[in-house]
Amino acid sequence: MNTFPSTNRSFFSSRWLLIVTVVLLFGLGFGIRLYQLTNLPLDFQPTRQLLSMLKARGMYDATNPPGIPDWQRQMAIQQWKTRADVEPSIVENIVAFTYRFTGEHFWIARIYSSLFWIIGGIFLFLLVRDLISVDGAVIATAYYLFFPYAVIASRSFQPDPFMVMSIISFWWTFQRWTKRPSWLWTVLAGLLGGLAILIKFSAAFFVIGAALGLGFGKFSWRDLIRKPQVWVMALLGILPAAAYLYDGLILNNFLRQQFGGRFFPSLLLSPINYINWESKAALAAGGLAVMFGLLGLFFVRQRSTRFFLYGLWGMYILYGLYFDYHIATHDYYQLPFIPIVAVSLAPLADWFLARLAELSAGRWLRIVAIVFLAFGLFSVLWDIRDTLKLVDYRPQAAMWAEIGDKLGHGSGVVALTQDYGQRLNYWGWQNAEIWPNSGDIDYHELRGASFNSSTNFARMTNGKNFFLVTDFQELSRQSDLKKSLSAFPVYAQGDGYIVYDLRNQPAP
């Protein structure tokens, strides 16, 4: 008997069909994320992934593993220690610990991130099943697992997949608490909400939004504030992040410089910024999916579910208004939006599959409908496979190692290079002072700073030996820098790089 909110006829009324479908979804969802497992992580947000890779390598090398030269161990630790810690390095610590048993393989992180996303999908299925229906849960989960951007982003080495998993698990446990306010659900919801916020402080928007929506959808505000369990949940949610902030801002002072540049009041009045925000949201979640998700709000029957979705959408808007620069420039800031759209699609999907179930009541018609749905899933998977196979980045490791050897792995290097020099750091074992790209210059000018290329060149190259260029597109955008470098002889050159010798006087 169907005990879930929907009263529609179920397309997945057969228990075996449902089991096979769910197992297939999660099996394929995990499998496609492991495709091209050992390809270098340069296909998605390489700057952020390399940051985590450098941290994990430094943590691992600090344990004195065998077979690593002392100079490399010291450099790895130094590269780790000099990286900013905006949030706790939880995932990096997990990966570094795993390196003790597997050796250093960056793709270990890809497996962990994929697992986090899959586990999040399990909680999403349970949540939507309880709020909408089994049919809605199947479609919401399929979207969450197989939207192309979600596949590529969810296997990246950064805290976001872990954060999204924790957010969704909080949604489910809090929803269970609203149905049965026991101390077990209280503690679980508080701990999972606290974990999500600790992983990344921005998760607070989606934890609070869900809690407010579900809470006010079920109880009055007077009932909520009178419940001791609510205060315990709030305390458990706040304490972990508060302790980290106290350590970083008061005790050890390593966070003071990390919270600037997140909010620009002027961008709130910029139409272009809102267009860029929409563009990033459409890239991450799909413009049509967002539209159908919004239309899905009209199909919600239960007050608690409706308020839950209102809370999520409302907090997403506040999240974007607060992170007004990053929401329009960093597409991975949209990752928590994917499960919001997934849940919002469920009511419309439930209605659609109910109509499909009525129209395919016969056995053969039902089989044909299943084949059509399977074809759609196969097509999406094949397109994702083609995308993942498109570029083989593995040869780049040898190029960066060659550059490091040419530069001698020492100091005295300035570089105009990709990802703030982190490819050079990781595969080339070479540190460098990084010349700003045009995006950085624009960002700092937005914050009120000014930039003079000639003055900056004289300051940064004073006492240096080499100037490395690997980002030639960026060099073409900075004509003043190009002119300054043309006065120096070329020290070394290869496929994808050129090194200028700063030790010699400029040519007359």
Model-flagged regions — what are they?
Residues 52-62, 195-198, 204-308, 312, ...:
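Transmembrane-lumen/periplasm boundary regions of multi-pass, lipid-linked membrane glycan transferases
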Residues 29, 140-145, 193, 197, ...:
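Short helix- or helix-capping micro-motifs
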Residues 30-34, 203, 348-353, 363-392, ...:
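Transmembrane alpha-helical segments
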Residues 149-162:
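Short acidic/glycine- and proline-prone juxtamembrane loop motifs at membrane-interface regions
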Residues 26, 124-146, 164-165, 184, ...:
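Transmembrane-helix signature of polytopic, membrane-embedded enzymes
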Residues 108-131, 169-173:
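Transmembrane-helix motifs of polytopic, lipid-linked glycan transferases
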